[in-house]
Amino acid sequence: MIKQEWKEKGYINEPVPEGMDLKAEIRRLCEEKNAVVLAHYYTDGAVQDVADFVGDSLALAQIAEKTTADILVMCGVHFMAETNKILSPDKLVLIPDLNAGCSLAESCPAEELAKFKAEHPGYKVVAYVNTSAAVKALTDIVVTSTNARAVVESFPKDEKIIFAPDKNLGGYLNAVTHRNMLLWNGGCHVHEQFSIEKIVELRSTHPDAKVLAHPECKSGVLALADFIGSTAAILSYAEKSDAKEFIVATESGILHEMQKRCPEKTFIPVPPMTGPCACNECAYMRLNTLEKLYNTLKYEWPTVELDETLREDAKKPIVRMLELSK
């Protein structure tokens, strides 16, 4: 029985028994219910450690499409859970907290994009995966930061393209592909917080460190980077590099996996422009906790549901992306 209080909160706030081994109980429930836990690199390290799969948006979408599990629990944000439901309509898709939104996805309401699209007939619409299902349904193809360049370059040079919603990623893609895509004016609140000044300060005290940046960062930050790439690409670069120190300009949750893969190396998160924090965290990602994950598996709620027509329309651009990424 799902309590009205839980529905109002968007998550189950039932206390877990004192002394419970949460990780063991989560694994027991997964085995009992044929469930898999998918966790994004930006979630808390404890959540990543208990997950069946940890990855970036592209990897998690590919896993969701292929897994034989009956239940998918998405420890990430809402658009990721929607993507799982789009690709796996017959599976029960759960998310530990319905409040886990995304500032970038919210910067592009579907009705506003539909109007913008109508004002620019003849343009193809390329949307970042950080969008709602309703926005995806309006697009020709979806991209992640891993495959965005390859997808954009798959279009003819003279193709007219609208890129939504991240203006920073779009600007980066325009620069590296020599395009002039029309850019939606959206941004990620985490990556928008990185500043040139903070990176210059860190470089002065760590002169041999390599600067790794996500393409959602502003152009001035990207200009200081030794490497620009998706979370998966940043991880790979750090593993292969001879450098021993890295200044990391993306959400700090990724440092957990970086340290696991490269225990002998030092990873320094770039702090936000303001505030006392030494790292830049996504508050939405941090809504995923072990307690909520346990309760979500126990009660099989909150669920993610989509209208079937919307799901079918949103699936087409995702499938095109996955086909290009094989």
What residue ranges belong to the model's regions?
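Active-site loop-to-helix "anion-binding N-cap" substructures in soluble metabolic enzymes
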Residues: 1-229, 233-248, 255, 260-270, ...
